[in-house]
Amino acid sequence: MQIQDCPWEIENIGKRTVQLNYTKDDIYNQEEVCKAVKGYQYLVAKVPVGNISCLLGLQSDGFKMIETQIIYSKRIKDFDFNDRLLRMFKGKVSFKQAKNTEQLISILERMTPNMFSTDRIHLDPTFGPEVGLHRYRNWMTNEFKRGTILYEFIFEGKPVGFSTSKINGTINHVPLGGIYQEYQNMGLGIIAASSTVLFPTEMGYKDVKSCRFAVSSNNMPMIRCYNYFNYRVDELEYVLVKHKD
């Protein structure tokens, strides 16, 4: 078990947070967990799917499962650029990269409390939509300051969502993204799902060979979109949480 202190969450959610990261071979140790979480208010545990010892042990000690994280990947050479749905959007979609703080703020202002309705902070009654939004805004701002690429999806001349791109060697990592609330449930998830490949391709990042990102099991609409494009599931992790006030 790896113990990860999360000091940034004090600003994001107002609680001292620790994350317990398990491997598939770890055996649950109650004494070890009690020692690790001392002094923290919000406890998060990530357990590889199949490690029942840690899953049941955490649950018996008051942790509650809130989601499963699905780690997807896709090799660009395996992506179908001639897909029929992509052809329907051809000429209607473009990407606009945020280059300065003013453009970052414009994107932050378009984000609304119910935009991230499948996020675990949003869904947790202790936190709720407003805290979830605050956390996402802080997260995106910090990513932007660290040099992560931030861009919007422009559909028929209107910004309908955003995504991020953190290119590490040949891999496009996608920390976060979403469709703006007013454009949800309109079939535009296809734009978000394909952007992980199309953005680096169309913007000239020739060294990028694949993409990788995590999606919550609570987000069924996007899971359907990624499955439609045959993204590969590389990993699954149970995510459990506990409040200690």
Where are the model-predicted features located?
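Conserved beta-hairpin
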Residues: 47, 147-163
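Conserved beta-strand-loop-alpha-helix junction that forms the acyl-donor binding cleft
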Residues: 22-23, 45-53, 180, 211-223, ...
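Conserved active-site alpha-helix within GNAT-family acetyltransferase domains
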Residues: 50-65, 217-235
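Conserved GNAT acetyl-CoA-binding A-motif
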Residues: 38-48, 171, 200-215
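Conserved N-terminal entry element of GNAT/NAT acetyltransferase domains
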Residues: 1-13, 75-102
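Active-site rim helix/loop that mediates acceptor-substrate recognition in acyltransferases
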Residues: 53-54, 127-150
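A short beta-loop-alpha structural element at the N-terminal edge
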Residues: 24, 92-119
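Conserved acetyl-CoA-binding loop-helix of GNAT-fold acetyltransferases
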Residues: 26-36, 179, 185-202, 224, ...
